[in-house]
Amino acid sequence: MRNEIAINHQMLRAAQNKAVIARFIGDSKMWLEANKAMKSAINLPWYRRK
């Protein structure tokens, strides 16, 4: 059996860019939003998937 993990690469890249910008300007709220978007892009949490 093969485990399929669907990753939205476009959304992940956008969230990573947002995180870089947030870190550069020192905006922790923006960074947390980017972190949440990155988790969403990689379909976390995996342990709940069947």
Curated annotation (Swiss-Prot):
Function summary: Gene kil kills the host upon prophage induction.
Protein name listed in UniProt? Protein kil
InterPro entries xrefs: Phage_lambda_Kil
Q: One Pfam family, short name please?
A: Lambda_Kil
Say which species the protein is native to.
Escherichia phage HK022
